[in-house]
A protein has these predicted regions:
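Local beta-strand N-terminus motif with an aromatic residue
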Residues: 27, 70-73
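N-terminal Rossmann-like dinucleotide-binding module
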Residues: 1-51
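Aromatic "clamp/platform" in nucleotide-sugar-dependent glycosyltransferases that forms part
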Residues: 78
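Beta-strand-loop-alpha-helix segment that lines the small-molecule cofactor/substrate pocket
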Residues: 72, 83-130
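Short acidic low-complexity segments
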Residues: 54-70
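Phosphate-coordination loops involved in phosphoryl transfer and adenosine-cofactor binding
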Residues: 2-4, 70, 94
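Amphipathic, non-transmembrane alpha-helical secondary structure
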Residues: 15, 19, 35, 39, ...
Length: 132
């Protein structure tokens, strides 16, 4: 069975994450609260970057997105939503959680809560920050 990934956010980052996951042969669901963003992903952003839309990627409005049974959940939404969505994503108990930078604002209490919750869920939590 293929590795299953849910990507929250159908903007630039969501498209990059979706393409990278498909290159690895993973099953990909992209979810967004804005149905117009999902349509832009399918008809504009993804095809412009990668040559054509990948019919193996499934698009869902957030309220219709499948819940649970994901190996990984990736969060590529606007920064002010990261920590809230990450905490909610952990309720699905994925094997791994990737949150794009920044994880949270300057108050690190929520970050500590996230890592404690991830540990209790046996989920590996990562922050996407690759500037070295």
């Amino acid at each position: 069975m293929a590795f299953k990934v849910k990507i929250l956010g159908a903007g630039s980052i969501g498209n990059h994450l979706g393409h990278a996951a498909r290159v690895l042969g993973w099953d990909v669901d992209i979810c967004d609260m804005d149905e117009a963003a999902l349509e832009r992903t399918r008809t504009d952003i993804y095809p412009a970057r990668y040559g054509a839309w990948d019919e193996e990627i499934h698009l869902f409005p957030v309220e219709q997105a499948p819940v649970g049974d994901y190996d990984m959940i990736c969060i590529g939404t606007p920064p002010d939503s990261h920590i809230e969505l990450a905490l909610k994503a952990l309720e699905e108990r994925p094997r791994a959680l990737l949150v794009e930078k920044p994880l949270c604002g300057p108050d690190l209490h929520q970050a500590q809560k996230l890592f404690e919750m991830a540990e209790n869920c046996d989920t590996q939590a990562f922050v996407g920050y690759d500037h070295v």
